[in-house]
A protein has these predicted regions:
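Aromatic "clamp/platform" in nucleotide-sugar-dependent glycosyltransferases that forms part
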Residues: 21, 193
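Nucleotide-sugar donor phosphate/pyrophosphate-binding loop at the beta->alpha transition
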Residues: 38-40, 49-68, 78
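Short hydrophobic beta-strand element within catalytic cores of glycosyltransferases
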Residues: 210-213
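A charged, aromatic-enriched C-terminal amphipathic alpha-helix characteristic of glycosyltransferases
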Residues: 112-114, 243-287
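Nucleotide-activated donor-binding/catalytic signature segment of Leloir-type glycosyltransferases, i.e.
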Residues: 157-176
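Donor nucleotide-sugar binding/catalytic pocket of nucleotide-sugar-dependent glycosyltransferases
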Residues: 63-112, 119
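Short alpha-helical donor nucleotide-sugar binding micro-motif in glycosyltransferases
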Residues: 8, 180-185, 266
Length: 298
């Protein structure tokens, strides 16, 4: 915590945003409250559901912690209207939208194929951390024609690989190779119920690959009416519906999620200090830091 305190004092931020509810986020939150600095936060992970999936911890306990953490935030940023509505029902305040963007230059259609030519088509792809909360087993156990591929690594990979020998587990991919994997697939399958958005959905769409998913947070805000994918309580039904979609239309839809729009929305949501207060505050803090250093050296 002392290192965070020193870095903030040296950097003199115009605004503070806390992107994690973990140890670094807790320390930064405590410093901001101590210094009476306004700050914003964001809700990237359905933490209560993740913890409940891994350990015998009731979801309500996780939500109690998250409400405590985000309560002093000037603005809690969330990726989708559906998540905003759910958090408001749980008693969260100051909830504001912050949509996501995708790198449409890296993730683009018609990249060089990366999967072996002898893998039967269609190729059904999942990308992400291979962990129980991602619900990947719902994908790999589907009865689908062609080849199922999982790109990524994680604690559940060895177990799934042993139990589903017909599925291709490639390990992690990055950069151009990852973009090629998205582009080479026929359908991207997103089986998670616990993500708050699912950036991989946009990455797949940017390459022209349609997305099949459950009607969960993220997919339910991105896919319906887009012509870029399908959602259904029966994941196989959603998968098969994607085979007939126009890949050019999928790409065109993804182009509406730009990094510029996402960045501008983020900046609008920040809670900077008024200029006059900021100058006085950091001047006072620098003076206190000098006094502390002198006392420590004495």
């Amino acid at each position: 915590e002392e290192e965070i305190r020193e870095r903030m004092a040296a950097f003199e931020p115009e605004a503070v945003h806390i992107a994690t509810e973990g140890p670094i986020g807790i320390a930064t939150r405590r410093i901001c409250l101590e210094w009476k600095l306004p700050f914003t936060t964001s809700y990237h992970t359905k933490f209560p559901e993740y913890v409940s999936a891994r350990f015998p911890v009731p979801v309500q306990v996780g939500y109690a912690y998250m409400k405590w953490f985000h309560k002093p935030s000037g603005r809690l940023m969330v990726a989708t209207p559906t998540l905003r509505d759910e958090l408001v029902k749980h008693g969260f305040r100051n909830v504001s939208p912050w949509t996501r963007g995708v790198d449409t230059e890296l993730f683009r259609p018609d990249l060089k194929a990366i999967f072996p030519a002898d893998w039967p088509r269609p190729i059904w792809l999942n990308v992400g951390r291979v962990a129980v909360e991602k619900n990947i087993e719902a994908f790999v156990e589907l009865d689908l024609p062609g080849t199922k591929v999982v790109v990524g690594d994680g604690p559940a990979k060895a177990d799934l690989e042993a139990r589903y020998p017909d599925v291709k587990f490639t390990g992690a991919m990055f950069g151009e190779d990852l973009a090629r994997a998205f582009s080479d697939a026929d359908v991207f399958v997103f089986p998670s119920w616990t993500d708050t958005f699912g950036l991989v959905i946009l990455e797949a769409m940017a390459t022209g690959t349609p997305v099949a998913a459950y009607p969960a947070h993220g997919p339910i805000d991105i896919i319906p009416g887009s012509g870029a994918g399908a959602i259904d309580d029966d994941l196989r039904t959603a998968c098969m519906a994607c085979l007939n979609l126009d890949r050019q239309a999928v790409r065109a839809y993804a182009e509406g999620f730009s990094w510029r729009a996402s960045a501008e929305e983020f900046v609008r949501n920040l809670q900077p200090q008024p200029e006059a207060e900021k100058v006085k505050f950091w001047r006072r803090l620098r003076r206190l830091a000098r006094l502390r250093r002198r006392a420590a050296a004495a």
